[in-house]
From Swiss-Prot:
Encoding gene, per UniProt annotation: JAB1
Complex formation: Component of the COP9 signalosome (CSN) complex.
Protein name (Swiss-Prot/TrEMBL): COP9 signalosome complex subunit 5
EC number(s) per entry: 3.4.-.-
SMART domains per the UniProt record, alphabetical: JAB_MPN (SM00232)
Gene source species: Candida albicans (strain SC5314 / ATCC MYA-2876)
Lineage of producing organism: Eukaryota, Fungi, Dikarya, Ascomycota, Saccharomycotina
């Protein structure tokens, strides 16, 4: 039986005398704040587990668990031990962690009274204990008993580890580890904690398991048989369950369900726990355990983090922040330090957007962005069928592992960006004139393409209207005047030189000039067209020189209006700022990876100086 169905409400705020039923087990819930006010129970009754011996002498001699493979059916966990396990698992993030369980054996129950961490080597899908971990395990327990002057009789009763994001169950390696430990130091218990689901749902996701002896002919009771069936995934939902698992765990899921069974879990507290919980209730306390409890008025759940923090952040983003490798347990950071970092990070995009809207975009950046926006609309019309085929062809083998996501490994055939950096370099190297021609072609193609082929999921009508509005912007006045028109003029000049002399000249202008000079009745000399052409060229050259002088005089003059106009053109007018903001908004809505690379603070310094 999975912990999703059995232990979803293991920390509910109800009376100790109230039981509720799940499909196959009973979980007794205890109010962690009002233990001393429970009716009909003396405070000393809470410490009954601490007065028990490490193991029942009769059970130690007879070892009934060797005869009955389902002998242990319940697990008691101290509230402080539960908090220590949850905090340890959360600080590990997407990396599996491991620790030991310390407690006692009483009747058919295993009592977990304390836990401690192990220095192990963990990954996203497994955890390995080295020689240092075993040495630490023995030394910790020895020193713990020495500090208690022999009064502490707890022994190691099991181990715990985490499954970040993929539920509480035992994989093949977990089953082997648990079977090995049960073979030489039974009674032994395995606990699995999922820190990701704990943060998402605000309830501790936990499960307690034991394995069947190898080669045993088990005939489990109806309760344990039901648990075994629920550990095994149903055929109808098997594929859906496997999709949320890492690739290395997909084959393990449900494959070993007949080799172990789960135990009922009950959370208990004691007078020692009450002292710590009382300190946690102090508003001035800043301990790392404080936010694991909340004084909730709801009777159906206890949240894992305070309500005001849940309103201000999305808890799953905190896990993603850890999975990026930003967390280092050696530096003393906790899960709540990362939450504060996330809050700061959440305000960054607005600051960046405000920074962009106050700056004038370079014309080259705008032209490149404009071409990519047009390409995006074209790509949405041509790849609709390909996306549909890809969505139906993806199987279980193509599911991404958490490690794959961190390495930015994409599935085959799925296009994640519009164009690579190499494509950008090629576009810049082809020449400004050719880029202008390609931009005109893109405009024509977008206008001619039928809009009804655009997939509404990737480009809706509002987005297309914004792209169409961008066609009215003249992004490249300077670019076209100095590059494209220059290219066209040089091309026309070559053709012009190859024409005959009488076709090369503008006959109407030349004849008008000849008549203006009073030579209407005279025959035009053969060399007059060349003389007239030279005069026209000198006039054009003089006109250009005069225009440059006038423009320089206006900029350097004493007129205040001219200076304001010059500064306005340098820093950008309100219209240009609005245009820049529209470009950023449109680019972010489309999701261009290249544009996101450009609209960062570092890129701003490179683009705009």
């Amino acid at each position: 039986m999975t912990c999703l169905d059995e232990l979803a409400h293991s920390l509910e705020s109800k009376s100790d005398t109230t039981n509720f039923k799940t499909r196959n087990s009973k979980i007794k819930t205890i109010d962690l704040y009002q233990q001393n006010e429970l009716s009909g129970k003396h405070p000393q009754d809470q410490d009954k587990f601490y007065r028990l011996p490490a193991i029942d002498p009769i059970a130690r001699d007879k070892k009934p668990w060797k005869e009955d493979i389902n002998y242990f059916n319940k697990c008691y966990i101290s509230s402080l031990a539960l908090m220590k396990m949850c905090t340890h698992a959360q600080t590990g993030g997407s990396i599996e962690i491991m620790g030991m369980l310390v407690g006692k054996i009483s009747g058919h129950s295993i009592i977990v009274m304390d836990t401690y961490r192990l220095p192990v080597e963990g990954t996203e899908t497994r955890v390995n204990a080295q020689n240092e971990a075993y040495t630490y395990m023995v030394e910790y327990l020895t020193e713990r008993q020495q500090l208690s002057n022999g009064k502490n009789e707890e022994n190691i009763v099991g181990w715990y580890h985490s499954h970040p994001g993929y539920g509480c169950w035992l994989s093949g390696i977990d089953v082997s580890t648990q079977s090995l430990n049960q073979g030489f130091q039974d009674p032994y218990l395995a606990i699995v904690v999922d820190p990701v689901k704990t943060l998402k749902q605000g309830k501790v996701e936990i499960g307690a398991f034991r394995t069947y002896p190898e080669g045993s002919q088990q005939q489990p009771s109806m309760t344990n048989k039901t648990r075994k069936d629920q550990n095994k995934p149903h055929n109808s939902g098997a594929n859906a369950n496997r999709k949320i698992l890492p690739k290395s765990k997909q084959k393990d899921f449900g494959s070993h369900a007949d080799k172990y069974y789960s135990l009922d879990i009950e959370i208990f507290t004691s007078s020692w726990d009450d002292k710590v919980i009382e300190m946690l209730k102090d508003e001035d306390s800043l301990t790392w355990m404080k936010n694991l409890l909340v004084d909730s008025n709801n009777n159906d759940k206890i949240l894992g983090i305070r309500k005001d923090e849940i309103r201000s952040i999305e808890l799953i983003k905190n896990y993603e922040l850890i999975s990026q490798g930003n967390h280092n347990a050696d530096e003393g950071e906790t899960i709540f330090d990362l939450i504060e970092q996330l809050k700061i990070q959440a305000n960054t995009p607005k600051f960046m957007l405000d920074k962009l809207t106050t700056m004038k975009f370079d014309s080259t950046f705008e032209s490149v962005l404009y071409k990519r926006l047009l390409k995006k609309t074209q790509k949405s019309t041509t790849t609709k069928k390909n996306r549909k085929d890809l969505s139906t062809d993806i199987d279980d083998e193509t599911m991404l592992d958490e490690s794959d996501l961190e390495k930015n490994v994409g599935t085959g055939g799925i296009e994640t960006s519009i164009s690579s950096d190499d494509d950008d370099e090629e576009e810049e190297g082809e020449g400004e004139g050719n880029s202008s021609s390609r931009r005109d072609n893109n405009n024509n193609e977008v206008e001619e393409g039928p809009t009804d082929e655009v997939d509404s999921e990737y480009a809706n009508e509002e987005l297309l209207e914004e792209v169409g509005a961008l066609e009215n912007y003249n992004f490249n006045d300077l670019l076209e005047n100095k590059s494209a028109n220059k290219f066209l003029r040089s091309e026309q000049k070559i053709k012009h030189k190859n024409r005959p002399i009488h076709q090369r000249m503008d006959n109407s202008s030349m004849i008008s000039e000849w008549n203006r000079l009073g030579h209407q009745q005279q025959h035009m000399p053969a060399d007059y067209p060349y003389q007239w052409s030279s005069n026209v060229a000198n006039l054009v050259k003089t006109s250009k020189t005069n225009r440059r002088r006038e423009r320089l005089h206006r900029l350097q003059g004493a007129s205040i209006d001219n200076k304001k106009q010059f500064e306005l053109g340098l820093h950008g007018s309100p219209e240009s700022k609005a245009k820049s903001a529209n470009l950023v908004k449109l680019a972010k809505s489309i999701g261009l990876n290249e544009v996101f690379d450009l609209i960062t603070l570092d890129a701003q310094q490179k683009l705009f100086g």
